Amino acid sequence: LRHLLDTRQPDGGWRCEKYFFGRGPETDYSNPLPTLAALDAFRFTPLVNAEPALDRAVDFLLAHWVLRKPIGPCHYGIGTLFMQVEYPMRGYNLFMYLYVLSFYSRARKDERFLEALHALQSRLREGQIVVERVVPKLAGLSFCKKGEKSEPATERYREILKNLEADE
């Protein structure tokens, strides 16, 4: 854990050092997906909601919601693919973004998080998550059929809502 905290970038996030698309001003940023993955790991530790460095990482991801443009060496952006609900969660997308950030009180109180949550809620069908993008090798499984409601995904959505109740 100490190594992760010590390797954060000045903007609060984490990054990989693979420059698939070359270098430019956008590559000075951290990468959103590694930052989200690190926060996902830290949510299982006593440092969640107690470590200021994690607040900076949360702030970095919330700022990306507004910035939206592709950033970091791997050029993660918030566009059409990001907005598609992917289940099981594995990439940088709206559902995973909200799920992980929902464990952080700093995010739950932020209008950018709430705006992102509203965007996810606008995609619900009868209060359930509809899978819009599938991990190709899992496409045959019943719980993650493209265009269909998914009970396991909806359970993750309910966890987001439960996490929001922690601040009430």
Where are each of the predicted segments found?
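Catalytic-face loop-and-helix region of soluble metabolic enzyme cores
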Residues: 121-126, 133-134
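An alpha-helical repeat/solenoid feature that recognizes helix-turn-helix modules
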Residues: 2, 6-56, 60-115, 130-167
